[in-house]
Amino acid sequence: MKISVLTIFPEMVEVIKKYGVISRAVQENKIEINIFNLRDFTSDKHRTVDDYPFGGGPGMVMKPEPFFRFYDFYVQAFGKPHTILTSPQGRTFNNDLVKELSLKENLLIICGRYEGIDERVMELVDDEISIGDYVLTGGELPAMVMIDAISRFVPGVISDESVIEESFNTGLLDHPHYTRPREFNGRKVPEVLLEGNHEKIELWRRKMSLKKTIQRRPDLFLKKEFDEVDKIALLELLRELINDVK
């Protein structure tokens, strides 16, 4: 999978390639990440990428010419990409969208800056995507969030089991995790995790996931389609709640 980013701050985005799972995936050629500097596609000695808005108003607007020069170069070099513009006006970035984008072979993420991008650039854009209902100074951080999330669904980047068991892929929040020591500051690891009974461990983990989801994300709980393990875990939760009331 190829993911490319167009930005005026390439050094900021390059960091995503240097650490952890993403770094290893790049080194093993599981994913290819290319970072391009929009200023390299300007035509003046000052490498200008912005100008004053027609009609007046605060701030600057990113000029269209560098984007179109870059896009022509990119298509000739790598083929036509699925082009994303980071934008607070876009679709909300969530797990379903992550899965959808992970199936694309050639992604291009355009990072906005200033007051926005000349509207004519939208001819090149397939998707506007927002990582939340708030405004950032630029699209570089959203681009890095997208790269990290999308890469995890690319085959071979992390284990299939890890992807399946992560929060949101099951429709629930993750269960609590524990490691050594067995007791710390008077707090013990739940006994069920030490007994080696995998069925009981799975049931406990599902019960904890359901409990956490009910408490923190009831919206997810209400959308969840429950399987048999969920139903058994919910019954246990209900019994515990009744016993606590008693």
Curated annotation (Swiss-Prot):
Gene3D superfamilies per the UniProt record, alphabetical: 3.40.1280.10, tRNA(m1g37)methyltransferase, domain 2
GO cellular component: cytosol
EC number from the UniProt entry: 2.1.1.228
GO MF entries: tRNA (guanine(37)-N1)-methyltransferase activity
Subcellular location(s) per record: Cytoplasm
The keyword Cytoplasm is annotated on this UniProt entry: yes
Record keywords, A-Z: Cytoplasm, Methyltransferase, S-adenosyl-L-methionine, Transferase, tRNA processing
Catalyzed chemical reaction(s): guanosine(37) in tRNA + S-adenosyl-L-methionine = N(1)-methylguanosine(37) in tRNA + S-adenosyl-L-homocysteine + H(+)
Positions bound to S-adenosyl-L-methionine: G112, I131, G132, D133, Y134, V135, L136
Gene Ontology BP term (one): tRNA N1-guanine methylation
Pfam family membership, one: tRNA_m1G_MT
Keyword S-adenosyl-L-methionine among UniProt keywords: yes
Disulfide bonds: none
Main location: cytoplasm
Subunit structure: Homodimer.
Family: Belongs to the RNA methyltransferase TrmD family.
Function: Specifically methylates guanosine-37 in various tRNAs.
Name recorded for this polypeptide: tRNA (guanine-N(1)-)-methyltransferase
Organism of this sequence: Thermosipho africanus (strain TCF52B)
